[in-house]
Design a protein with these regions (language model features):
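Accessible peptide chain termini
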Residues: 1, 21-22
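Flexible, solvent-exposed loop/hinge segments and secondary-structure transition points
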Residues: 22-140, 144-187
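Bacterial N-terminal signal peptides that target proteins for export
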Residues: 2-9
């Protein structure tokens, strides 16, 4: 084998490894850092997984009251696919039933198009009812499939989480002006 052929073979192998690696989810995205969560819930003192759905975390203040929940949309059914696959969006759902914010986690969308989805689109989720009753953010031109998938995924995941017993009880209590303290445990 000549040096030229060997170089071409190595280059092809490296290209394949890079292409396969680009399709893999980003490492370290399994849990959102407390600093990011504090951006949505400044009084964060603890994060506790829900008993019924450990992938959904209750965000609690120093008194143990639930401020809301955080979860990644691609871990909650129904999962909506973008152009190239699932888009994992971190969602902060407040105890008042409003979306506090979203942050893109893992995705396999084309970087060229996905980068067109900017801060104004993400900000458009903030302070919207998680049930979608006050409309949804508009899709982004030139990234229509990805932005629509994100919107459908966020609101679909919110509806699923709001249907969980621990969450629906807290939302009902908040609607009635009651405290979000966890119920005392029986011995």
């Amino acid at each position: 084998m000549t040096t030229k052929n060997r170089t071409a073979l190595v280059l092809a192998a490296v290209t394949m490894v890079v292409a396969v690696r680009a399709q893999q989810p980003a490492a370290g995205d399994a849990k959102l850092a407390d600093a990011a969560v504090r951006g949505w819930f400044p009084k964060l003192a603890a994060r506790t997984p829900l008993a019924s759905r450990p992938e959904v975390e209750a965000v609690r203040n120093p008194k143990g009251e639930a401020l809301g929940w955080i979860f990644r949309s691609d871990q909650i059914e129904p999962v909506v696919r973008g152009k190239r696959g699932e888009i994992g969006v971190w969602v902060a759902l407040g105890a008042d039933g409003m979306i506090r914010g979203v942050k893109v986690g893992v995705h396999r969308e084309d970087k060229k198009w996905f980068d067109r989805i900017r801060a104004p689109f993400y900000k458009a989720f903030e302070n919207r009812p998680a049930d979608g009753s006050r409309g949804r953010p508009d899709a982004v031109t030139t990234a229509t499939v990805s932005s629509r998938a994100m919107t459908d995924d966020v609101f679909g995941a919110c509806r699923a989480v709001m249907g969980l017993p621990e969450v629906s009880e807290r939302l009902a209590a908040a609607a009635n002006g009651q405290s979000g303290k966890p119920a005392p445990t029986r011995k």
